[in-house]
A protein has these predicted regions:
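Second-shell loop/turn segments in exported
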Residues: 28-34, 67-73, 83-94, 107-108, ...
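N-terminal targeting/tethering segments
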Residues: 24-131
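Peptidyl-prolyl cis-trans isomerase
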Residues: 199-241, 270-271, 278-279
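Bacterial N-terminal signal peptides that target proteins for export
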Residues: 1-9
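Surface-exposed patches in mature extracellular/periplasmic domains of secreted proteins
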Residues: 59, 90-99, 209-216, 255-258
């Protein structure tokens, strides 16, 4: 689930700081995506956070490092502007209620600081301006408004149309999955995890119960994944590697051992339980509608390219900082 709403926006909220400080150069256009301009304050936010994560704040960048960071920034800004362009396509905008929510969010964050100086001091720590914070926070609300427009246009069933919602959940787009998942936290423990996954698979092939092996080997707890019912998922909700295996299977079939960025997996595709789906209709339809949103989102994302402006080409990315003008 490394997608737009639960990825980039969740990371933003985890930052938890904003700033009122801004300068006119912050709105200079560094790049263009799909006909939309990318302002310095946005590009800089991604560039400096990516630098912090990969190399550290004080690292001296060479040409290869700058190129890698600019590539990552390209993916970041394509994410944001794919949403903006999709919203325009559907006529989705932030409402007055949304603006009020953003005002409340900003005021709540301001209250975390002893005074205005402390509030402003957060700027250099997290590479944000208040304007950009509002924009990034508003993206989550905007995405929900796009989903609402998809329902209004009939591309998704209305929430209260339970017959159509149930039909959507019964479709092959959604799968019920049980999973033996063996997590490894570091490269040093990878071989241990692989051996455990292979041992579980060997016992599975010898006729032992998938559910019993889930309980014995899986890194999931019963609270995270209901062992008896499994979990319901779709493309763009499941990990890419997991969904690639699940969609190959018919109900009752299981995969071999495969690896994702999070560990080793064996998945079993199960028959869906109508009673369980009815009981959890709202939760499952939320997964369904968001996955269909991502389907449209990434279809547009894949058409976009990032082009640097003349101003962006002249920026000294090795020395880029919050004081950049």
């Amino acid at each position: 689930m490394n997608r737009f709403l639960r990825g980039a926006c969740a990371a933003l909220l985890a930052v938890g700081v904003i700033s009122t400080m801004s300068c006119s150069s912050d709105t200079r256009k560094v790049a263009e995506v799909g006909g939309e301009g990318v302002e310095l304050q946005e590009y800089r936010y991604y560039f400096l956070n990516n630098k912090r994560e990969l190399y550290g704040d004080d690292a001296e960048l060479d040409d290869a490092s700058v190129a890698e960071l600019k590539k990552m920034c390209g993916e970041n800004v394509k994410n944001r502007h794919a949403l903006s362009l999709l919203a325009k396509e559907y006529g989705a905008k932030l409402s007055e209620d949304d603006d009020a929510k953003l005002d409340e969010l900003v005021e709540a964050l301001k209250s975390n600081y002893a005074d205005d100086d402390a509030y402003k001091a957060a700027l250099t720590a997290d590479f944000l301006t208040e304007e950009l914070y509002r924009e990034l926070s508003g993206d989550m609300l905007l995405a929900e408004n796009v989903i609402a427009r998809m329902k209004e246009k009939g591309e998704l069933p209305a929430d209260d149309d339970t017959t159509s919602v149930d039909a959507a959940l019964r479709s092959d787009d959604m799968a019920c999955v049980k999973e033996i998942y063996v997590y490894y936290p570091s490269d040093e423990t990878r071989e241990i995890a692989l051996n455990r996954a292979n041992e579980a698979y060997s016992r599975l092939m010898s006729g032992e119960s998938f559910e019993d092996l889930m309980r014995e080997y899986s890194s999931y707890s019963a609270e995270q994944v209901p062992y008896d019912a499994g979990y319901y998922t779709m493309r763009y909700d499941a990990l890419d590697e997991v969904w690639a295996e699940v969609e190959k299977l018919s109900p009752g079939e299981h995969s071999g051992v495969f690896e994702s960025t999070y560990g080793f997996h064996i998945v079993l595709r199960c028959e869906k339980d109508a009673d369980y789906m009815a009981e959890h209709r709202e939760e499952l339809y939320d997964i369904y509608s968001h996955s269909k949103f991502y389907e449209r989102f990434y279809a547009l994302y894949d058409t976009l390219t990032v082009t640097m402006t003349g101003y962006g080409d002249k920026l000294d990315f090795r020395g880029l900082s919050m004081g950049e003008k």
